[in-house]
């Protein structure tokens, strides 16, 4: 390697052969060098409000180093870290991840980067994952925010957790000490990265300083950036090498700035990615094929209003990977981006893994190379300097010939040397002569370019996120879907060139009559909703005959054979017949747009949820029934607000309460004063499908139904309705309830209007448990049968607690109930809130608490400060009506779901049940059943607990005969 000239900023200049020689041999010294420049980090906050700009935090590399040094000194002074021992850094945002990555590294410990995505929705899997980390990393310390501690606290003792908030250096410097002096060797570990999140057993990959710098030298040599001093940008989470190594460390080592953007900002509106690339003159960023496909569709549809007028992409170098790139997408987008100055062959498909520090094999000529050879999918190019690849024959007899399919193996300085504390996995991962087995099947074409051609493992890869098929099978089994035969589900990933990414194919054996279109529709809708919730994608569902799904002598379906048969077209006739039957049924339900506004909103919904034209989704179909995620709801909300230029914009709660194109249109008309007079309807339809007895849910004291949305996705066999309190639409003249009797009678009347005959099933969460009891009591008094009445973590005697819930308590409860802050943090603000409330400054109290809330969650909810004030006042009014409530009378039976009590109410579950919940026995004729569920009073329906909660609920409903 020729000698390079070291620039005055301490960074290296490319030599004549394209390689660089850095003046440091570890990333700590790289940060110290970067701290002597004026470069730094531009970190954006989550934007879900619909505006085109979001606030950004500017942190120079000098400030990053100083903050990390102060934190490291504090960690060392408290003896919290040990040199060369892992410390888990668990964060949901880039700023925390960066600061605490360096804080841990500067103590000499090994930062292990994780995020909320590593946790399964299944409690058993979460515990298994944490136990595995406990063993693999030798009981590591975990640093995180209080708001993210839930999964760790539910498995207390596996990992010692400390909150970032409790570790920040004192403003007065009282806990300050000298910054640590650390000089890592090249072979020291710079980070531990996990190979998988919630699926499978995670392997910890040690990435050394030498490996990082070798990888960055190779990446730099391949790219030959036209604007080498321009910033890098990432919207990927920091627990992925595509950000930590390929952007964050890369930018620091290169001595350039970096832009960190939350994924939601890009995924909600991909056009904003182009705007950010232009505004910051970004040279290097990463995006997968599905995002390019979304961009192309937006351009093709002419939806470019949000693009900057002076868009300039001249500096751009687009790394892409994680899934195969469709050449038609790249070729279609290339001339569009070129109009804004993007260079030819702007797409750089690559092959990379955690074990290779992200991309290590690059195609520098996409789409031209692959267009000339008529490829459907982009090739992955050739190895960067310092890396070699080979294809080994499937029979193990040696190296494959060009074009011959085999096992991809790689070696080189940028490749890791083995998994942390896992000798078995390490032995399996390397050949006898030391080459790394990637686990991919591939071939090399005549031009020397790599092509992937399948995987030796069964992972489903959707938008770069991997899922285990057997976990999806299990989720479908657990859901007990009407119309589907138990043990006859088979999930796998499949893809054609026309698809942006892999999709989950679900093959199942129907339990309905072939001519029953309604039952077929309900079964398919349930499958779609469930898989969409787990994978954030719409599955391909195909019902088969029993003879098409033979089982082995051990009772197993052959996933490989069924996948091969589907992809060979053997089930095409069944799929076509199924689609025709679904269309027939939808034709009987479909609602056509009655106005231009309805047509616009329907079009936005169809585009966001990518509902095919063949699917007759109409204006009366619920967004929620299509498996829409919270991100989908936010995206639809933003686009409707923007395209219809609404004076009073929609909020996230509107998306839930008016979840059809027609409902949203009526909501807009009501709030703008142009529609018919608003009429309060207490019923929110969370899940319209299924033939079993409907489940009615009563809101907690906050009056809203947001808490039930995740649960409704898991209830597939019956309609799910929820009651929403009166008074939220104050602008339309809607006034709050004035008495509990009005609440009981209003909800009972609405219930009878939708379901005139029993048997009935009703449950209430917290405060709603009391309301459910009173409604059930009235129904029984009128001769109706109530087979299921549920109180979810509420005792019968509540007036003492209601008297404690003054206005300041209500605002505290609301803010941690909707995840704006955790309970412990919320209560630290009680004195200030009491002071503001005494002064009659309630709106100021909301604004004060907002300053201490999670800004990303605030934006996601999309509500104004004034709306929160209305909400708190309604909650206070609702609970104030119960200060003199005394239970009386009785119901036939009651099921009490028991979660951890509020800390202000009881210390333990035993005390909670025996001291307070047991009093229900005086108001139930045939006995009370208690069912313990995971989580605490305000968390038992959160994503990490809701799957098992739903499983318990389904069991109880079955036992009660509904």
From Swiss-Prot:
Its EC number is 2.3.1.-. PROSITE patterns: AMP_BINDING, CARRIER. InterPro entries: AB_hydrolase_fold, ACP-like_sf, AMP-bd_C_sf, AMP-binding_CS, AMP-dep_synth/lig_dom, ANL_N_sf, PP-bd_ACP, Thioesterase. Residues 34-462 are annotated as: Adenylation (A) domain. It comes from the Eukaryota. The keyword Phosphoprotein applies. One of its GO terms (biological process) is biosynthetic process. Pfam families: AMP-binding, PP-binding, Thioesterase. Gene3D superfamilies: 3.30.300.30, ACP-like (1.10.1200.10), alpha/beta hydrolase (3.40.50.1820), N-terminal domain of ligase-like (3.40.50.12780). One of its GO terms (molecular function) is CoA-ligase activity. Residues 694-951 are annotated as: Thioesterase (TE) domain. Pathway: Secondary metabolite biosynthesis. The modification O-(pantetheine 4'-phosphoryl)serine is found at residue 630. Keywords: Phosphopantetheine, Phosphoprotein, Transferase. Disruption phenotype: Abbolishes the production of asterriquinone CT5. Residues 595-672 form the Carrier domain. Belongs to the NRP synthetase family. AtqA has an A-T-TE domain architecture. The adenylation (A) domain recognizes and activates the aryl acid substrates, and loads them onto the thiolation (T) domain. The thioesterase (TE) domain shares the missing condensation (C) domain function, and is responsible for condensation and final product release. Nonribosomal peptide synthetase; part of the gene cluster that mediates the biosynthesis of asterriquinone CT5, a natural product that displays potential biological activities including antitumor and insulin mimic activities. The nonribosomal peptide synthetase atqA is responsible for the production of the benzoquinone derivative didemethylasterriquinone D (DDAQ D), via condensation of 2 indole pyruvic acid (IPA) molecules. The symmetric connectivity of the 2 IPA molecules is thought to arise by head-to-tail dual Claisen condensations catalyzed by the TE domain of atqA. This is Nonribosomal peptide synthetase atqA. It comes from Aspergillus terreus (strain NIH 2624 / FGSC A1156).
